[in-house]
Amino acid sequence: MDRVNRLAAQRAVVIFSMSSCCMCHTVTRLFCELGVNPTVVELDEDPRGKEMEKALARLLGRSPAVPAVFIGGRLVGSTDKVMSLHLSGNLVPLLRNAGALWV
């Protein structure tokens, strides 16, 4: 859990992902199209990925634990929460407040 929190706090937007997960790719692409440069942590490519995946599953209360999106060091959630924020118009202000967007 400490590693997850430390990584999440290092950048404005952090996405914990799996390289073969289509929803992870979709969420990452959304942020890129909005002009955000997210830090993507590929759990299946990290030696401590399984440990982080278990910690994220506990935080999210579900499995699979990816994608897990943190904005401004806070857990936002997974695909459903990110898309809900985007469609309601609340994602961009959240990104601005976190310093991930300047415009």
From Swiss-Prot:
It comes from the Eukaryota. Keywords: Cytoplasm, Disulfide bond, Electron transport, Redox-active center, Transport. Residues 1-102 form the Glutaredoxin domain. Disulfide bonds join 21-24. Signal peptide: none annotated. It is found in: Cytoplasm. InterPro entries: GlrX-like_pln_2, Glutaredoxin, Thioredoxin-like_sf. Belongs to the glutaredoxin family. CC-type subfamily. Has a glutathione-disulfide oxidoreductase activity in the presence of NADPH and glutathione reductase. Reduces low molecular weight disulfides and proteins. This is Glutaredoxin-C1. It comes from Oryza sativa subsp. japonica. The gene is GRXC1.
